[in-house]
Amino acid sequence: VLHKVVQVRLYPSKEQQILLAQTFGSARWWWNYALNKSIEVYKETGKGLGRSALNAFLPALKKAEDTKWLADCYSQVLQATTLNLTTAYKNFFDKRAGFPKFKSKHAKQSIQYPQNVKIVDSNIKLPGNIGVVKAKIHRLIEGKIKTVTVSKTPSGKYFASILSEVEGDVQATDEGKIYGIDLGLKHFAVVTDGEKVSKYDNPRHIAKHEKNLHRKQKKLARKQLGSNSRNKYRKVVAKVYEQVSNSRQDFLHKLSYKLVSDSQAVIVENLHVKGMVTLEDSLTLRYRNHNLAKAISDCGWGTFTNFLAYKLERKGAKLVEIDRWFPSSKLCSNCFYQISELPLDVREWTCPHCGTHHDRDGNAAINIRAQGIRMIKAEGSSVSAVGGEVSPILGRKSKFRHSPMITEAPTSTVLGKLG
């Protein structure tokens, strides 16, 4: 079974926009209420509230005078909100995400329909009182529709992310190239296939819009709090951020598509982006360096890895993530000698053992690729690799892990190839 996600643009009528706003508000209020109730119960008893316990509050809330408007919301939307909250708690306790946060009406709004959504005459029919919403469906929706997430961006656009389930097995492939990728700031990605090293420049998306963004943020700051003009100008600023996000997603999709199209495996480092940009203590989360944090966040390394993962999974190819502590830059790819220190400002170095001169990032990509091939062979999979014999690392071996396959696809489409 394969899961696919297609995002489509929605064009609701004025009446439907009002109904969607009410549904967004109900789901957001219920999320915040359930989260607050869970926190209170945990403080009192030391135990949390499960999905069933939270849903048990809904019937009484729908009958109460102050919250009877909850009854107007499609019931499965509220139940899906409960499920998402309990999933957020599970991810927190499994150390895959931070603690669940309260939702704001000024952020992106979203609701989820777990079933009963249909495609009608190239439009989308939502259950409940919203009905058929005009949509721009740009590609075929394959298989059975499982869930549909309807969202509204801060700039005022509506989208539906359609998750479908397609029957059939994906055959694993052992044909194609094996890429090793070193992600960075000057060059977004340094890639090797065992024969040559290619460098892809960092587009620096935020830097291109920084002056425009700064100018519009200053105008927004001068607007009176709570005024209509401030609310309208908030959308103007949101549109600039949306342009930045769209250009980043476009670049990441095109580059990931280019690499996946002719590969049997892609090998990357398991980077801890949050640890790179912040210092975490018991009281707060602080930036290590504001400019560096902004540059790293702008790259979208984590999103790029996710894009690689789901594209490779659909093809039957592998994504391998090597341990972040693997000394890819300090290890000579020719003789496997490891130097003790290599400051960030040193971009080239010569191995004192064999005399090979290295480009820092190119050497790292070669080592990442070699380590990934060792991992693939260690688990018993066959690969056809070019670029010479892969030798074992001298000395102590680093720890590494094989990344799980990702079934959740991102909500953007591939627009074409690079270059």
Region locations from a protein language model:
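Positively charged, helix-rich recognition surfaces that bind polyanionic ligands
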Residues: H3-K4, I141-K144, P154-G419
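Short, Φ-rich (hydrophobic/aromatic) sequence segments
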Residues: W30-S38, T81-Y89, F93, L213, ...
